[in-house]
Amino acid sequence: GEQFIAAGRMDNLSSVHASLEAMKKAAEEYQGKDILVMMAFDHEEVGSSSRYGAGGPILADVLTRTARALGANEEERFQMFSRSSCASADAAHSVHPNYVGKHDPTHHPIIGKGPVTKINGNQRYASDATTVALWEAACEKAGVPVQRFVGNNDVPVSYTHLRAHETPE
């Protein structure tokens, strides 16, 4: 029969596990010269703005120092950042029958029907037109169905402020 697991931090732990498995597979198959990076951040539940949260400086610091250690000059570092992409993994909630109004009426994620792309009109997630297209193309290539979650704009959403796309100084 089907089983359910309930535990604290399950969304974060499952995202880290899935990311590590994907990174291992990508590293085995990757033929390019660029560096594959996977970061796991802390403090998502309190806004991600701590030193070790996604809104903090640690990712930009690590990438900048890595580029410098590999001999990249400033222009090469800027080029590295401009050809980079980023995915943010988190658990999505399916529609709760008692809180249907918290979801956009046309986007209801269903448990077990594939990963969910989270979209918010106020840019509260790492998704935009480019990242959604890249993600959905990768899922299609892998034969993985994709769902979309669009938050009801009248209901605030929790989010991870991810600074990874910002070029460090």
For each feature predicted by the language model, list its residue ranges:
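Hydrophobic alpha-helix feature that most strongly marks membrane-spanning transmembrane helices
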Residues: 27, 140-147
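Single conserved hydrophobic/aromatic residue that forms the stacking wall/gate
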Residues: 161-164, 168-169
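Glycine- and acidic
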Residues: 1-8, 41-44, 115-121
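Beta-strand segments within the central parallel beta-sheet cores of soluble alpha/beta enzyme folds
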Residues: 33-42, 78-81, 85-87, 149-151
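Alpha-helical metal-binding/catalytic segments enriched in His/Glu/Asp
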Residues: 6-45
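Small/polar glycine-rich anion-binding or flexible loop at a beta-alpha turn
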Residues: 150-162
